[in-house]
Amino acid sequence: MASSSGNDDDLTIPRAAINKMIKETLPNVRVANDARELVVNCCTEFIHLISSEANEICNKSEKKTISPEHVIQALESLGFGSYISEVKEVLQECKTVALKRRKASSRLENLGIPEEELLRQQQELFAKARQQQAELAQQEWLQMQQAAQQAQLAAASASASTQAGSSQDEEDDDDI
């Protein structure tokens, strides 16, 4: 891994993750960029070594998918047996987190109401909302019609009073 081509960058751990790990592990220590790069390269090489060994173990057991057990066996066969207890703890934590995520995403399924019933209830709610909207529109229409009728009556009343006032003026003119 001496070369630093674009493909090698795809196969490394993100530097931000390494920097975070270094800060958490050694909070009061300054680490040179060369040392950080060395840690990235060591981590990458370690992952390649373990994954290659786990792949061989997987192939020997005639499986197509590398399982956590294959990784644990690879650690043991490469002399990293002292890491196995921590690896198992982390594996259990990952399983717990994944289970919580699945439970959270399956809340709908855990309601105990069949999907067909939920869809029926949803359609019923939509129908009620459409009915309420139609009733509101009808009320608005009736209010507009009443307002228009009142405006017409007011205009007719004003016109009638204007005509009555002008005919009263004509009668007053006749008296002179």
From Swiss-Prot:
Where does this one sit in the cell?
A: Nucleus
Residue numbers covered by motif Nuclear localization signal: 100-103
Q: Where is this region: Disordered?
A: 152-176
Q: Which domain of life is it from?
A: Eukaryota
What is a single molecular function from GO for this protein? DNA binding
- Cross-referenced InterPro entries, in alphabetical order? CBFA_NFYB_domain, Histone-fold, Ncb2
Q: Could you give the subunit structure recorded for this chain?
A: Heterodimer with DRAP1. DR1 exists in solution as a homotetramer that dissociates during interaction with TBP and then, after complexing with TBP, reassociates at a slow rate, to reconstitute the tetramer. Interacts with NFIL3. Component of the ADA2A-containing complex (ATAC), composed of KAT14, KAT2A, TADA2L, TADA3L, ZZ3, MBIP, WDR5, YEATS2, CCDC101 and DR1.
Task: Please give the name of this protein.
Answer: Protein Dr1
Q: Give the organism, scientific name.
A: Mus musculus
